Amino acid sequence: MNISAKDLTVIPECLIVLIDKPNRGKTASMRNFACKLLARRGVSFVHPRSYPANLKKTGKDFTLVVEISGVRVGIVSAGDGDDCILHAVKVFAKYECRIGVMVVSEPARSGGSKLALDAYLKMKNGCKARVIEISKASIKKDTHEESNAEVTSILLNTLDFELKHTK
């Protein structure tokens, strides 16, 4: 899988990236974030097939594109595979997202994709976007649910800050 210079020409102004090892609840956290975001006033769908069908199913990857105060926000959880980064980049380009929120899996001995992480690092170094990385592993809570709630809160606060500065 290669991310070309052409793919990087339409990268959002800001990328918010949730990083952790495979099977650690990144998609569940992203799903919670998306559901909380959709519950807000002033959020309209750009990519309508994403919800509610995909968000109701747990453990499933999804793509969601919304518009908030005139700013398009793409949210992509495309798994741990080699093509997950390219899929996110293409979604952000297709829907002209100014802010992109995505999941990146760190490689692990038991799985994960070094190719995907390498592609992400290449994309990060090759684009002019602000890249905000949130490490799910650094959030220590007693339960999985508490950890997901904390990640959701961080994602929402980060997005709110970026929306104020992306016009």
Stretch-by-stretch model annotation:
Residues 1-12:
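Pre-Walker A adenine-sensing motif
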Residues 14-41:
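Glycine-rich phosphate-binding P-loop
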Residues 42-107:
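Conserved nucleotide-sensing/catalytic segment adjacent to the nucleotide-binding pocket
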